[in-house]
Amino acid sequence: MSASSTDSTEIHISGIARDSIVDGEGIRLTVFTQGCPRRCPGCHNPDTQPLVGGRMTTVGAVLAELDENPLLTGLTLSGGEPFLQPAALLPLARGAHARGLDVWSYTGYTLEELRAQENPAVDALLDELDVLVDGDYREEERDLTLHFRGSRNQRVIDLAATRATGTLRLLYKDE
């Protein structure tokens, strides 16, 4: 894919998993963003919580990693809290879609909390996502049998179907 002006956009990350099968359907490249204000007890990624630490990378560098693995079916944004840097992640999500990949994101916020922010960058990122796994992790609701989430309060929202129907659509709704 050709370089674009957004390739130099910086993203603060903790790390990258290059061939994840646990962060969404298929084989995924997962970007773990750095920084999360939620501090959920029992957090799966506590090292991603501090706003300091991690490293800076660029959208272009992550897109190049997507290009290196023809087996990938998607990109997952995790954390940390991806919605602390929605403007930086938007061109990454668009670049993944341009490559024919689906895009999932995890967040400690609910979809309703994110929409209530009335933040154009948050709204634009939500509009670009295919799936959102929302809600804070709750140790008392932990359930290892759930698909792609750790506690029963979390939802796996099919945002593409939600946009198409105007009604909230969940994946794995029978769990």
Predicted regions and their residues:
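Residues at the C-termini of beta-strands that transition into short coil/loop
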Residues: 17, 136, 160
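N-terminal [4Fe-4S]-dependent radical SAM core
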Residues: 1-32, 41, 45-51, 168-169, ...
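Conserved Radical SAM active-site core
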Residues: 8-14, 27, 45-125
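Conserved C-terminal portion of the radical SAM core fold
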Residues: 69-77, 133-136, 163-175
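Receiver (REC) domain switch/active-site residues of two-component response regulators
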Residues: 130
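P-loop/Walker A phosphate-binding loop and immediately adjacent motor/lid segment at beta-alpha junctions
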Residues: 85-97, 104, 142-175
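Short glycine-rich anion-binding loops that position phosphate/pyrophosphate groups of nucleotides
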Residues: 82, 137-138
